[in-house]
Amino acid sequence: MSDLLAGSEWWFLERLHYEGALLEVDIAEGIISAVSEDVSLDKGLSIEGVSPIEITEKSKHVRIQFPHVLAHQITDESYCAPEAGSTKEIGGRILCQHTDSAYLEHVIKNSLIDDLVDDPVCHYSLNLADHIIDVITTANPSIELI
């Protein structure tokens, strides 16, 4: 399962669809361009030789399905804080399972999950180039090349 994601460190969100407690997330691999460019910054500063990360015809496209979803959220990666607790990398740093996370604690504390769900509840995160997707579920995700 993890081999599809571990081969690249840059992934971009293409599509997210939620229906009937199934969350489908389609992502595309970002590839570092062979062509570099100079980037101008504020106050007359610049960085030379920057290579953009792009989705190309060579990019892999992957679908990750989370069944039995109880809650999910999408956060702009610029505003996301690191998770407390332990983290198990499933697909490199891209797909992770969290234990004792602040998000899992928040969802359980502010919902009826503890009262209504008998199965163990898990917190997964997808750490993409521009988005962090947190998922609370009672089942393992599946990953497939599309």
What are these regions (language model features)?
Residues 1-146:
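Surface-exposed, interaction-prone regions used to assemble/regulate multi-protein complexes
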